[in-house]
Amino acid sequence: MKVIFLKDVKGKGKKGEIKNVPDGYANNFLLKQGLAAEATNSSMKTLDAQKRKEEKDAAAEVENAKELKETLEKLTVEVKAKSGEGGRLFGSITSKQIVDVMQKSHKIKLDKRKFEMDDAIRALGYTNVNVKLHPQVTATVKVHVSEQ
């Protein structure tokens, strides 16, 4: 029997795959558990439409990430902090503080976990920080730390 897998089934198939499986296995397990649906013409058309919609959504998501990347790379985030001798900061600048400043001054809301910082910023001056907007899109934000 030809079935369309609705969920991943270990050793049999992944979600969205169309495979031939034994009739008994399909009727008694896959269909009853809701793991698969019988592959009819209408269900195949529905699956194709769903796949096209997912591809379109993924392409739109990448496009939005690229637009945001262009915006982020044009701006400089100004962060003020107290510093001591030699430009060393009292404390450090974390991704959370950068996100807060971006929210207030540029009205751009990002998740702090998207910032790829090896370590917090501990000195005055300019620093480039990578932001992972999408698995395929990474932007670089210029952060300027100045004295308060």
Curated annotation (Swiss-Prot):
This protein's record includes keyword Ribosomal protein: yes
One GO MF term: structural constituent of ribosome
UniProtKB keywords: Ribonucleoprotein, Ribosomal protein, RNA-binding, rRNA-binding
Superkingdom per UniProt: Bacteria
Single GO BP term: translation
Database matches in InterPro entries: Ribosomal_bL9 (IPR000244), Ribosomal_bL9/RNase_H1_N (IPR009027), Ribosomal_bL9_bac/chp (IPR020594), Ribosomal_bL9_C (IPR020069), Ribosomal_bL9_C_sf (IPR036791), Ribosomal_bL9_N (IPR020070), Ribosomal_bL9_N_sf (IPR036935)
One cellular component (GO) term of this entry: ribonucleoprotein complex
Cysteines engaged in disulfide bonds, as pairs: none
Keyword flag Cell cycle: no
Pfam families associated with the record: Ribosomal_L9_C, Ribosomal_L9_N
Family statement: Belongs to the bacterial ribosomal protein bL9 family.
Function: Binds to the 23S rRNA.
HAMAP family reported for this sequence: Ribosomal_bL9
Identification of the protein by name: Large ribosomal subunit protein bL9
